[in-house]
């Protein structure tokens, strides 16, 4: 949304919802953690809107490399093709709802979700605490 949305919604909140959705789908602890971390590169490189990012191939390369390092550090390896497909399915479903709820009604049939979404504005401290709680829970079980 980058300022165009009805209310603030952080990348952290989006990632928390992705992790919760992965858990609700019964995916592995590794996939829950990957879902939480999938936008972690944006902490360092910023959240660039997709239409603009698509025009920045060098940016995409650097972002992919940074995400590779993050996955190596916290998951032990990059995602497999199957894991990447699962993550993209969750991320795209969540983005559909993010756009529908925060920007404008989306066309077509909504993707199936296994969690209830709540776009309540939360304090940074509360979001950070929940992100860390999920990270610690699933990174402990990943070792």
Which positions does each model-derived feature cover?
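Metal-dependent phosphohydrolase cores
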Residues: 1-143
């Amino acid at each position: 949304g980058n300022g165009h949305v009805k209310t603030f919604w952080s990348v952290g909140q989006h990632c928390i919802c992705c992790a919760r959705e992965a858990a609700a789908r019964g995916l592995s602890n590794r996939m829950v953690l990957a879902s939480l971390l999938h936008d972690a590169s944006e902490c360092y490189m910023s959240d660039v809107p997709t239409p603009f990012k698509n025009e920045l191939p060098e940016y995409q390369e650097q972002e992919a490399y940074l995400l590779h390092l993050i996955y190596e550090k916290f998951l032990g390896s990059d995602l497999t093709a199957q894991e990447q497909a699962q993550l993209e399915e969750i991320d795209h479903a969540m983005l559909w709802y993010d756009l529908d709820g925060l920007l404008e009604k989306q066309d077509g049939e909504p993707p199936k979700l296994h969690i209830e979404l709540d776009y309540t504005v939360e304090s940074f401290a509360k979001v950070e605490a929940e992100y860390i709680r999920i990270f610690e829970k699933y990174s402990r079980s990943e070792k």
